[in-house]
């Protein structure tokens, strides 16, 4: 499974593409998208969309993990963030990607072990987990990689849980019928 993690922002949007192999995680790409403040807002959204579309076409992820909206005190910033998130969600739907989103607390907990971790602690853990030696990595980018890792961990956990449900053995004929109603001929 290849996961594209996105830390959305109206000024800087971070992204990271990771996959899991037998040897561990593989990092395909990561960067910060900076449309520039001189273009108008719709052009910034288009720039973010176009850049992420190129990433999707290049790496063919199966899942897009996005951080849920952060609710700050500035309503205008929240509206802009919502528009960026909307464009990213549409992009995921256009490419039939599994779309999942996680709160900042969930992401921090899955990577750093605590939902109260600082951005710097998250960046440190991401670099350790993915064997990245990049002193200049933007925090938006390390957040995006953390979001991708969280998506990967949660998907693997859900798959294991579903497998457990499917492989439960019935201890009696009645339980078998209850667990498999499709086998009953009426």
From Swiss-Prot:
Gene3D superfamilies from the entry? Ribonuclease H-like superfamily/Ribonuclease H
User: Catalytic positions?
Assistant: 7, 67, 140
User: What are the EC numbers?
Assistant: 3.1.21.10
Q: Which domain of life is it from?
A: Bacteria
Pfam families per the UniProt record, alphabetical: RuvC (PF02075)
Instruction: Determine if Cytoplasm is one of this entry's keywords.
Output: yes
User: Mind naming one GO cellular-component term on file for this protein?
Assistant: Holliday junction resolvase complex
A GO term (biological process) for this protein?
DNA repair
* Residues that coordinate or bind Mg(2+) 2: 67
Q: Which residues bind Mg(2+) 1?
A: 7, 140
**Gene Ontology MF, one:** crossover junction DNA endonuclease activity
Provide the cofactor note recorded for this chain's UniProt entry: Binds 2 Mg(2+) ion per subunit.
What InterPro entries is this protein classified in?
RNaseH-like_sf, RNaseH_sf, X-over_junc_endoDNase_Mg_BS, X-over_junc_endoDNase_RuvC
Q: Where in the cell is it found?
A: Cytoplasm
Going by the UniProt record, its keywords in alphabetical order are: Cytoplasm, DNA damage, DNA recombination, DNA repair, DNA-binding, Endonuclease, Hydrolase, Magnesium, Metal-binding, Nuclease
> What reaction does this catalyse?
Endonucleolytic cleavage at a junction such as a reciprocal single-stranded crossover between two homologous DNA duplexes (Holliday junction)
Name the needed cofactors: Mg(2+)
This protein's assembly is summarised as: Homodimer which binds Holliday junction (HJ) DNA. The HJ becomes 2-fold symmetrical on binding to RuvC with unstacked arms; it has a different conformation from HJ DNA in complex with RuvA. In the full resolvosome a probable DNA-RuvA(4)-RuvB(12)-RuvC(2) complex forms which resolves the HJ.
What family does the database annotate? Belongs to the RuvC family.
Biological role stated in the UniProt entry: The RuvA-RuvB-RuvC complex processes Holliday junction (HJ) DNA during genetic recombination and DNA repair. Endonuclease that resolves HJ intermediates. Cleaves cruciform DNA by making single-stranded nicks across the HJ at symmetrical positions within the homologous arms, yielding a 5'-phosphate and a 3'-hydroxyl group; requires a central core of homology in the junction. The consensus cleavage sequence is 5'-(A/T)TT(C/G)-3'. Cleavage occurs on the 3'-side of the TT dinucleotide at the point of strand exchange.
Q: What name appears for this protein in its UniProt entry? A: Crossover junction endodeoxyribonuclease RuvC
Origin organism is Chloroherpeton thalassium (strain ATCC 35110 / GB-78)
Q: What is the lineage of its organism?
A: Bacteria, Pseudomonadati, Chlorobiota, Chlorobiia, Chlorobiales
Per the record, the gene is ruvC
